[in-house]
Amino acid sequence: MGHGKLKKFAENETFKCLLQPAADEVLAGRGKDFLLKDHPVKGNWNSQMFDAPRPIVLELGCGRGEYCINLARRHPDFNYIGVDIKGARLWKGAKEATVNHMGNVAFLRTRIEFIEAYFAPGEVSEIWLTFSDPQLNHENSRLSCPMFLERYRKFLAPGGMIHLKTDSRFLYEYTLAVCKENNLEILAATADLYASTPEGSVSGKLTLPGTEPSGFAGPAHTGEIRPEVREVKTYYETMFSRQGYKITYLCFRLPSAPADAAAMADASVMPDASAPADASVMPDQIGHLRSPASFDADYWRSVEGPRHSVSLPDFEM
């Protein structure tokens, strides 16, 4: 390990805005399987990590924290939490938040598989998935797969939105398929964010009727793609855009967690950390969201391109 990383890890310990729990703080038991247990911060983020109580917006796989930092500046009436497992990446965002005395930004270093151990039902208003790994060979490792969506809706407020922004056409199409398979409400969907209006829209404004339900606590969404979706760019987005990849964007709602799924939140069985990602509990075992069973096979029959590509050329299904 390089001296630079060691220095960042040491400085991470000094940042009050960065929470770095040890694995045994959220895992109980021995052997191949572990039981997930609640962390003390669960239900207490507003009182323990921020300078004032506000609706909480979560970014999963935040990397260097560019989205969290920029959104926090644009929306001071909301609290933002960036989650990632890489401490060297989190250092940049935590450093910037600390230097600029940003009281509405926090970071959490943990595996996203453990995310429900940190948030109480209704504690999070909105979720962003920005340029996460498409996990071409492991469906259950995709952050927008039914198994992860079941975890999110245990703590996402009623009417809460999930934003997916990615250079991977594969992940975008897969997530669309998940939404359609489960009749999830799609608010915006564009396969080329910087060159087109949202699919099913005119001049960038959605034609879908209806307004936000009263239970929604996130920043107002009036049927248009928010300016920050295009204006805020992560390190990876900038890199992929320069390489010619199209950026896709999808926004959808999750229904509230069913009673049986919520009740299982305190007794979730987690796989051994050394086990393959797709050896996890299957979606039907933890909730009611279904996987688009034939999507992967159909996709690769429809698209020319190597399986190892991070992103794929544009295509029509």
Where are these regions (language model features)?
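S-adenosyl-L-methionine
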Residues: 94-121
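A short glycine-rich, Lys/Arg-flanked "PGG" loop and its adjoining helix->strand segment in the class I
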Residues: 144-158
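Conserved beta-strand signature within the Rossmann-like core of class I S-adenosyl-L-methionine
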Residues: 159-166
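Class I SAM-dependent methyltransferase "Motif I" SAM/SAH-binding loop
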Residues: 61-65
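Conserved SAM/SAH-binding beta-strand->alpha-helix loop
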Residues: 86
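A short acidic, Gly/Pro-enriched loop at the edge of an enzyme's catalytic core
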Residues: 118-126, 131
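SAM/dcSAM-binding transferase cores
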Residues: 1-52, 190-266, 272, 278-317
